[in-house]
Amino acid sequence: MRYLLDTHVIIWLIEDSPDMPPDIKEIIKFPENNVYICSISLLEIAIKMNLGKLTLTVTFDELLNYIQTSDFDILQIEDEHLKKYLELPYIHKDPFDRLLVATAKAEDLTIITIDENIQKYDVNWVW
């Protein structure tokens, strides 16, 4: 299977949060699954850290190193993702999450998310 991590999942992974369900951890760590992180999630984390709205127990460099040394693939924003973004109904106000939905649709990925607004879209998701 092919999965896209929502930003909160990345944060919960790096922070080893007890909020992360064990079955979701298993999906992410299962070697036959391909797990992707969208570059927009990294931008969202950087912005929130810069504004003081997010504090992690690791630095941003350590977060990047964790991602690079794990088995995650980074998806850059592509033209097709932006086209899908423009086609989305305005269910969710958060532009970062809307771009994650568009990316998942364009790349045929299942989003791992607890976000009920993302779950309202016509996109595969799991939690």
For the regions a protein language model found, what residue spans apply to each?
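Short, well-structured N-terminal submotif of metal-dependent ribonuclease cores
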Residues: 1-37, 53-65, 107, 116, ...
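Generic structural signal for small/hydrophobic residues in well-ordered secondary structure
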Residues: 6-8, 45, 85, 104
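Alpha-helix capping/helix-boundary segments
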Residues: 9, 41-42, 81, 100, ...
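Active-site neighborhoods of divalent-metal-dependent phosphate/nucleic-acid chemistry enzymes
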Residues: 57, 69-114
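Basic, glycine-rich
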Residues: 119, 124-127
